[in-house]
């Protein structure tokens, strides 16, 4: 999924006619906060109000941190992400010699592609480059508020009704339908 975020940023930079930047340089610009928000919003974009596959089935341990939802398992194990190494500040892509080839289930790949394409279509109201924007957007959603001010800080993503409300609010905020 990180690779898809890098591709997306490359597309944005080309549209803005910015100087060409390598994927490694783009990756260096991804803070953990930005990655966690993009992960959450990608999962949320994949959610549909019916039984089916969504990314919350894989990334299912979100907690409310001060700067928005964080997938705790990913955050805690960020130094062990396959094909990337964490140098204390940001992720670095491993060389092809060091990288581990992993096959991704087709349903997961399709879900990721659909969710990211959905977000890309909202480029006028969803600024994936701006970490502060992503944090503020996450703070406008009800699940973060409910969890942040509770004793557990756990986002209740297993509750379909809550997730449906979250998705509707998210869609309203990013102007779905425009």
Model-derived regions: residue spans:
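Domain-edge interaction signal
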Residues: 1-178
């Amino acid at each position: 999924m990180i690779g898809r975020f890098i591709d997306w940023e490359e597309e944005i930079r080309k549209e803005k006619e910015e100087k060409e930047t390598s994927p490694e340089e783009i990756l260096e610009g991804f803070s953990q906060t930005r990655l966690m928000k993009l992960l959450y919003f990608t999962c949320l974009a994949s959610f549909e109000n019916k039984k089916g596959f969504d990314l919350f089935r894989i990334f299912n341990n979100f907690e409310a941190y001060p700067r928005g939802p964080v997938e705790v398992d990913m955050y805690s194990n960020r130094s062990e992400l396959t094909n990337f190494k964490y140098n204390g500040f940001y992720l670095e892509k491993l060389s092809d010699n060091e990288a581990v080839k992993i096959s991704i289930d087709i349903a997961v790949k399709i879900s990721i592609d659909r969710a990211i394409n959905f977000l890309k279509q909202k480029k006028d109201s969803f600024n994936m480059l701006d970490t502060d924007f992503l944090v503020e957007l996450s703070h406008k959603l009800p699940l973060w508020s409910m969890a942040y001010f509770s004793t557990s800080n756990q986002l209740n993503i297993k509750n379909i009704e809550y997730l449906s409300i979250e998705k509707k609010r998210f869609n309203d905020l990013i102007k779905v339908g425009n």
